[in-house]
């Protein structure tokens, strides 16, 4: 009777923590979206879609620590299986539960990215065109969404028939081990199709991480440390600029006081000056509001705390940088090479974050908290990067992300980007802590011969405890389903590996750029020349 009770208690503990995190995630997503959505253009369907999409992404990341916890808690610290996990069928049943969770969440992600979010986006675009016919709006939105459905179907079809064949010039021993690990996951064509589609989305997420997260990791802490410019100084500077522009306008208008028309060049200069004057007046209104804003006054009082938080964030960013560099260097030196996706079993170089997670894992849920903090850190730094850069398509800026003034379409774009970014964080966390993500804190028993001077006693051996790695017997270590899901296709792992190097490079560039920039304005991003009057009035009133 003890075995089922122990099994139930271990499972309930892991899933109870997951449920608590789930509720926290839902609350966070609601507050996050409500903070940035436009107050006058808010749309119920786009708000709900954005909240659900972001929640699904974060929940998927929250499942990773549960996966690691379950494979780790099957064993005692001495390397033996616990009584309730001694049966291989029981272990498979537990891991299948996690696998079904990944199946469900990844399927929902595909549904959101390729069907639901595009449909809501195009539906709102049709609404913007003053189309009051609901049926026609739905019809046109579905027409545009079909293209995304075709892409999704193509990815699923390709994933179904892409074989996991051995690439040329591979290390046969390593590759045989890789094949065995994937056989553990099963050979279902449905799984292969889903894994291929998710890996394709993760590639897009990798590009978003390289673009937004790498820059955000440098700009967020440095902005906290540097702070903002003084509101009083900015108002004085804005007043002086306004007076100077008004003098230039009066000077140009004086040229036509006697009825003579202005030249083409003067008319163009006059128009530019009037536009600049309008922008300065708007800046003045925003600065006046900022001066009266209680939040800015509280922020000034909390300045020391912001500096400490900025120092903490930059230290965390540097820790990630060093850890990722060591992990990539380890793969370059000790993996089977590009032909196997730079897959490596265990760690050969000391990895600080991996060691920290392994140390915290036995005291559950400390490792769960740390993984959640890492995921949230990626989200916050990604959001900082997106807000500073905006949403771009090549060299064209599509949308700006600003508190209480973000359009519904921009919110949908924002959540899709964050969804893809969080999707890629599963591989990023593996890169930061490969041993932890693959095996958790599992250990196994190894028989080693004892040296002896007496030939008749040469068969004596001792049992030692080792951390699970590729050399462990097949029935002694269980690999997390997350690792297998993300590494089923070796060529994706190869691209992820080079993407990590690009991430490190962009982070260094962003760090240099952020250091060279001065303090940002207290109304940074609130007033731009290409803003509409409607957008400005929404903020002021």
Curated annotation (Swiss-Prot):
Cellular localization per UniProt: Endoplasmic reticulum membrane; Lysosome membrane; Cell membrane
Residue ranges that the UniProt entry lists as topological domain Extracellular: 1-11, 72-101, 167-189, 328-365, 431-488
GO terms, molecular function: cobalamin binding
Family stated for the protein in its record: Belongs to the LIMR family. LMBRD1 subfamily.
GO cellular component, one term: plasma membrane
Keyword Cell membrane: yes
Highest rank taxon of the organism: Eukaryota
Glycosylation sites: 78, 88, 171, 348, 459
Key words, A-Z: Cell membrane, Cobalamin, Cobalt, Endoplasmic reticulum, Glycoprotein, Lysosome, Membrane, Transmembrane, Transmembrane helix, Transport
Chain's role: Lysosomal membrane chaperone required to export cobalamin (vitamin B12) from the lysosome to the cytosol, allowing its conversion to cofactors. Targets ABCD4 transporter from the endoplasmic reticulum to the lysosome. Then forms a complex with lysosomal ABCD4 and cytoplasmic MMACHC to transport cobalamin across the lysosomal membrane. May play a role in mediating and regulating the internalization of the insulin receptor.
Pfam families found in the cross-reference section: LMBR1
Gene Ontology biological process terms from the UniProt entry: insulin receptor internalization; protein localization to lysosome
Statement: the UniProt record of this protein carries the keyword Transmembrane helix: yes
InterPro entries documented for this protein: LMBD1_LysCbl_Transport (IPR050854), LMBR1-like_membr_prot (IPR006876)
Organism: Danio rerio (Zebrafish)
Signal peptide: none
Membrane-spanning residues: 12-31, 51-71, 102-122, 146-166, 190-210, 307-327, 366-386, 410-430, 489-509
Name this protein carries in UniProt: Lysosomal cobalamin transport escort protein LMBD1
